[in-house]
Structures are given as structure tokens and as C-alpha cells.
């Protein structure tokens, strides 16, 4: 259509993979880094970096992104994820202050802090996945759903087929040593990217917001979300379409939703939580993976920019 086009690139001699998906290509807001201006932001792509081997974006696509130079790409480490897309751990939201945006990062550490707070408040038996099951099947002779095992199925779809979720509580999560170890590993992966993003986008800690998140490792040792990943949201100006996390419910309210609202709404953002378990989360995606947002073009013309 008018003012809208596309480019088709495909490799001749190598197979494509999930890292070639456009969930693995993001663009930062405009930034200034060490005196250099990036008026159209910088391209972010996920890779196997810093590992010498692993999945990478196919050569022709990667080379195409690097060749345009105006939005000089930043390569991040995303191969630790089962799908491998960087939008599973980082996104940006607009603000009306001088910075004009915040970077959001998925944070297992923030989730564990929140759960420990609730446990100390006497809410350790608050249930997760309220109205959703957490196992492929039910225990023989019982109507209860099982908590996901330490290295269970890769697909979260297998975790939501039951009906009774009373066994998945804050106490249960906090007592799962294997899950804790896995999330310590995930946090280290995210922290590696945090340092890269701070350096390459000129960010300070005050420019970053940590959203509570939990992950599990699949049988290949790759991470998948333990509950719907709120970072993989749709950003529509001040309105955020956030995957409903189905976190522990205490006092009739999900503590994850409450914490996310407390972090984002003071910035003038409106949080709307959308259920996407059946439609996207069960296939290792979230609502953002099945939507396409048409952005308003920058007033600044890219051809006026000197790389």
C-alpha cells in the first residue's frame, strides 16, 4: 500500500531458524551514546553471542541489517531461550519525561523478591494459574493438576490442561530448588544483555524497569516461560497489551499484575492484561507474536543521517 513496503531476503545454502523471526529484531528508541546520536534508534538482534557455537540469525538477513548502518545493530545473547527471540526478555515503553522511554527487562530476581515478600506477609499459599491447569494430564484417580517438573515439556501448552491448581502456590515455587537454580542461570543471561544494552544504548540503571518473570529449562536446556511472559507485550503509545500472567492470587488480585501496574502506571501508562494462554502462550509465544502494529513514521528522514 501507499508508504508501506517490504524486503524479501532468504539464504541459498543454509536453513532458517526461529532466530530469523521478527521477534528477534527490535529497534530501540532514539538514543545518544558517548556523543553519537542515533535519531532512529539502534537495531537489536539476538544471537548465540558470546558462545562460539549455537543458533544465529542466517547470514543474508544479518548482513542486510548490518549493511544499512544508520541504525547500527547491537547483537545480544538470545540463544539461551528455546525460541531464541530477544523480545522475550526486553522491550521499550514511552514516557513523557526527559528520557522519553524506559527499557523493560524480564527479571526472575524481581519475581523471587516479590514472592518472598508475599510469603512473609502470610500469603505463601496464594495459588498460581487460577482457573488454569498446570500439567498435561491429571494424577491417576485424582482431579488435581501437577506442578510442572524441573525439566518438563518444552511447550507451556502441556502445563495448562488440568483444572485444579491449588498445589501451585508461592510456597511451592519458593521450595523448588531446581527451579531456583534454573532461574539463577536465566538471570545471569539477562544480566549479560543488560550490561550490553546499557553500554550500547547509553542507559543508566534508572532507565531500566525489571518486570517479574520466571522461566524453566526444557530437555535441551533452553528456557521457556514458567507463566505468560509479561515483557512480550504490545505497546500502543500509552496503552500496553500485557499477557495475563496468572500469578498468585491474594485478596482477589494477582500479585504479579499489581506489581506491574505499580511499576508502569506512575509513568502514565495504561496496563491491560490479555489472556493468551490458548492462542499464543501454549505455542511458546505471547500476544505480541500474533499481532502487527503499524507505527507512525519518524519525522526525521533516515537519508539525512550520516552513519
Model-derived segments and spans:
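Histidine/cysteine-enriched polar flanking segments
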Residues: 1-307
Amino acid at each position: 500500500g501507499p508508504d508501506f513496503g517490504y524486503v524479501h531476503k532468504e539464504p541459498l545454502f543454509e536453513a532458517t531458524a526461529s532466530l530469523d523471526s521478527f521477534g528477534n529484531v527490535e529497534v530501540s528508541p532514539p538514543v545518544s551514546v558517548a556523543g553519537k546520536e542515533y535519531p532512529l534508534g539502534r537495531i537489536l538482534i539476538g544471537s548465540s553471542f558470546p558462545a562460539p557455537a549455537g543458533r544465529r540469525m542466517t547470514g543474508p538477513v544479518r548482513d542486510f541489517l548490518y549493511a544499512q548502518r544508520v541504525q547500527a545493530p547491537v547483537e545480544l545473547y538470545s540463544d539461551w531461550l528455546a525460541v531464541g527471540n530477544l523480545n522475550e526478555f526486553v522491550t521499550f515503553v514511552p514516557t513523557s519525561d526527559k528520557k522519553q522511554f524506559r527499557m523493560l527487562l524480564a527479571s526472575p530476581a524481581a519475581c523471587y523478591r516479590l514472592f518472598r515478600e508475599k510469603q512473609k506477609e502470610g500469603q505463601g499459599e496464594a495459588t498460581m494459574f487460577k482457573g488454569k491447569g498446570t500439567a498435561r494430564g491429571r494424577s491417576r484417580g485424582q482431579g488435581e493438576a501437577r506442578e510442572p517438573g524441573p525439566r518438563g515439556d518444552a511447550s507451556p501448552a502441556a502445563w495448562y490442561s488440568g483444572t485444579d491448581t491449588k498445589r501451585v502456590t508461592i510456597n511451592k515455587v519458593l521450595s523448588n530448588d531446581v527451579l531456583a537454580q534454573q532461574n539463577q542461570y536465566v538471570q545471569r543471561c539477562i544480566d549479560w544483555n543488560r550490561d550490553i544494552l546499557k553500554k550500547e544504548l547509553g542507559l543508566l540503571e534508572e532507565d531500566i524497569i525489571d518486570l517479574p518473570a520466571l522461566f524453566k529449562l526444557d530437555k535441551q536446556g533452553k528456557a521457556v516461560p514458567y507463566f505468560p511472559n509479561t515483557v512480550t507485550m504490545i505497546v500502543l503509545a500509552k496503552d500496553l497489551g500485557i499477557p495475563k500472567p496468572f500469578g498468585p492470587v491474594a485478596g482477589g488480585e494477582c500479585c504479579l499484575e499489581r506489581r506491574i501496574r505499580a511499576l508502569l502506571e506512575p509513568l502514565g501508562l495504561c496496563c491491560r492484561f490479555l489472556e493468551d494462554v490458548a492462542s499464543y502462550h501454549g505455542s511458546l509465544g505471547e500476544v505480541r507474536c500474533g499481532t502487527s502494529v503499524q507505527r507512525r513514521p519518524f519525522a526525521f528522514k533516515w537519508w539525512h543521517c550520516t552513519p
